[in-house]
Amino acid sequence: MEKKKQNKSRYISGLNGLRSIAVIGVIFYHLFPNQIRGGYLGVAVFYVISGYLITDHLRQEWQSTNKINFKEFYLRRLKRLYPALLAVLVVSSAYITLFQRNLLTNLRGIVFSSLTYTNNWWQIRHGLSYFDRFNNESPFTHLWSLGVEGQNYLLWPIVFFLLMMFVKKKKHIIQFLFAATLISALFMGFLYTPGSDPSRVYYGTDTRLFSLWLGNLLAFIWPSTHLRKDIPLKAKHLLNLFGGVALLLLGVAFLYLDARYRFVYYGGMYLISFVIVVLVAVIAHPGASWDKWLTNPVFTYLGQRSYSLYLWQFPVMIFYEAKVKNINKNLWLHTLIELILIFGISELSYRLAEQKGKKINWHALKMAGKSWFTKPTLTLATLKKAASLFVILSALVGIVFSKTESTTAEQQAFQERLAESQKLAEQSKNQGNTNDAEKDTTKEESKKPESVTPVQLTEKQILAGQTLSITAIGDSVMLGATAHLQEVFPKMIIDAKVGR
């Protein structure tokens, strides 16, 4: 079939700036969840960008050839994403096998689901929570998002092809995509249960697809190759204003939109995705200034490495914080060390896995492996290969021999702590109902602070805590912290239950 004329594809450097903001938001959300309460929305930013760029590329290919090369599309995605993912899975599994064997439980299922881009559904099936800081310390929790994106990579090119073949009219395609995003958002609201852990709707492909497909929708409305640089000055100012307002709203959401708010699941995340769509549209327009404003060496560096940064940030935090105790005593020092480790390892991942993975020659790699085993010589190159082989074998041992259980070791330990805390909570509740007379303690006794778990309180605050009469009602999180709370607040009456 004769090729149609196609406008030259554009590289939108400003999107690296948006990627850098997104990945920094996610990292600092995991480091400071009580301060950067909406940093998790960085994932929605990645989704909108991904949906826009992939659909924009598919449209250009269709306009040029009237077909979609599915094999090339999937191979290109695998070469782009798989090497770095394999690296983080292998290295982290080897570390767990050698140094942190309490995390071996279900390792095989985690790795398999991550490699097949089904980790989000695996975590849902096993009842794992993204928001439970006490119970879920897996270094692979964040890989749920790759599952959603990977499933979209598999599904969307097929849907795109069918739409272009049978629907054809742009107007009807836009209507279909918009309806699909609304259905996904409605699923999120329908499946969300107020007061319960929102991980099911947070992880689900069905409830998160709207961010990706809003990006797809934008590519039909706002194709990058059809946008003109020479636009009226008034239009340029208007675009810049929209971009500024969208970026401001996104920044406020990053700081304040707590994932525990009902609003997030009753349309809030959908609205934020719309805000991101506006921001991506303005950055993509060559007539606006935001592409230039978000293009600088720092943003370019972070944006190009955002995938590796996202992959490595959680394993580094989990492994580091498991080995280093009392981090709160020198919080900023330990945070700096974690950031240095994250950026250092991500740089290695970017250079050795992402960059080289795109150009890897599997046949040459196979022949090199054969020659090394037949004629091993002690050189720096062979030592590197031996070290790599040791890491891979360590990972395989852990993956093959890991236990498969419906609950993880951390969940089992947590259930035991919950049982103990339940007893303490009942004692506290009964004590509060029957021993009101004990409030008449002497001033000397009330001034003696009991030995409490270090929580960065001053002596004055500890003294005040000894005298406060507090009633606390909560769920399993409060139940798990009962012992520590009663050390600080001995007169506290705690009424906590699992699943409240």
Named regions from a protein language model:
Residues K325, Q355-R500:
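Extracellular/periplasmic envelope-modification machinery, especially enzymes
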